[in-house]
Design a protein with these regions (language model features):
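Predominantly late transmembrane helices and immediately cytosolic-facing juxtamembrane segments
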Residues: 257, 261-270, 274
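A glycine-rich phosphate-binding loop feature that marks nucleotide/adenosyl-phosphate handling sites
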Residues: 220-226, 270
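Divalent-metal (Mg2+/Mn2+/Ca2+)-assisted nucleotide/phosphate chemistry catalytic cores
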Residues: 20, 96-219
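Positively charged, low-complexity intrinsically disordered leader regions
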Residues: 2-42
Length: 287
């Protein structure tokens, strides 16, 4: 493992480019990596279902790479926000879950997460540690920092508003609650999919408002499902579960369309991209 602040050019290239869509801001993130500070790497998850799939693994692998460089992962269990459901990319309001359902799912999630993330270098924190102490005055003070107009700039909200589809007040609160998680743990870097960019940027802005150094936002690419068209999702039945039987997992991965193989290799493996792209003449093939 490299010591803090000591990062090779190859490690830096891998961390900041492989399986990465965008970093806001990349220059600041690189400076942090070289500063010698042990970074607090935040990833939140809403245990709205009991298991995870390879789409989630894209971000978890990146966290593990940074753990190998000496940094600390903070896993936020969204035991409050999971009851609402993340509205990112949704065309309709989600059904709210009970707190008991969320806690049960969380235990299953964590067991699977630690197949990828090093448990000894990770901290698990439940949102209820701070939201359980919130009173109405705190909620009013927090919501007063943003406007409805700002939140309606989100593409999914804007589309639903234009189509006169319902947007629950709880959904408008969701990005703000996720943002406050960053304040509560003093996050240095937050990780999420490209569909989470708005939420991550709200966290960055809220930290600045509250006197903290704004977090860096690390956006991971969306893994296309086994149908070769849509985002990997259990609701679309185009997913490969982390806890899947190996035979079933193999069968599903063999069904991945040819044009998606390179992205699967890049996002989910350590294979050098130059290796699978090199074609071997049939005369040199080993059978």
């Amino acid at each position: 493992m490299a010591s803090l602040g000591k990062i090779s050019s190859s490690d830096l290239e891998t961390v900041t480019t492989r399986g990465v869509s965008e970093i806001i801001s990349r220059e600041e993130f690189v400076q942090l990596l070289k500063s010698g500070k042990k970074l607090r790497l935040k990833m939140g998850f809403d245990p709205s279902r009991p298991d995870i799939h390879l789409g989630h693994v894209v971000g978890l692998r990146k966290l593990n790479q940074l753990q190998e460089l000496g940094h600390q992962v903070i896993l936020i269990v969204g035991d409050w926000t999971a009851q609402i459901g993340d509205p990112s990319g949704q065309s309709a309001t989600r059904t709210m879950l009970s707190h008991e359902q969320v806690l049960e799912n969380a235990q299953s999630y964590l067991r699977q997460f630690f197949k990828v993330v090093d448990k000894s270098r990770a901290e698990v924190i439940y949102q209820s540690e701070w939201f359980g102490k919130f009173d109405l005055a705190k909620v009013i003070e927090l919501t007063g920092r943003f406007t409805v107009a700002q939140f309606l700039q989100r593409a999914d909200f804007a589309q639903r508003f234009a189509e006169q589809k319902p947007i629950a007040i709880t959904e408008l609160l969701y990005p703000l609650l996720q943002a406050y998680d960053s304040v509560a743990i003093e996050s240095d870097v937050e990780f999420g999919g490209t569909d989470q960019m708005f939420n991550l940027l709200v966290g960055r802005e809220l930290q600045g408002m509250m006197g903290q150094t704004p977090q860096q936002c690390f956006m991971m690419p969306i893994l296309v499902g086994t149908d070769g068209v849509m985002k990997m999702s259990k609701s679309l039945d185009n997913y490969v579960a982390v806890d899947e039987d190996p035979v079933d997992m193999y069968g599903k991965l063999m069904s991945v369309s040819d044009d998606q193989i390179m992205s699967y290799l890049e996002y989910l493996s350590l294979i050098h991209i130059s290796e699978p792209t090199r074609r071997t003449p049939i005369s040199e093939a080993v059978f």
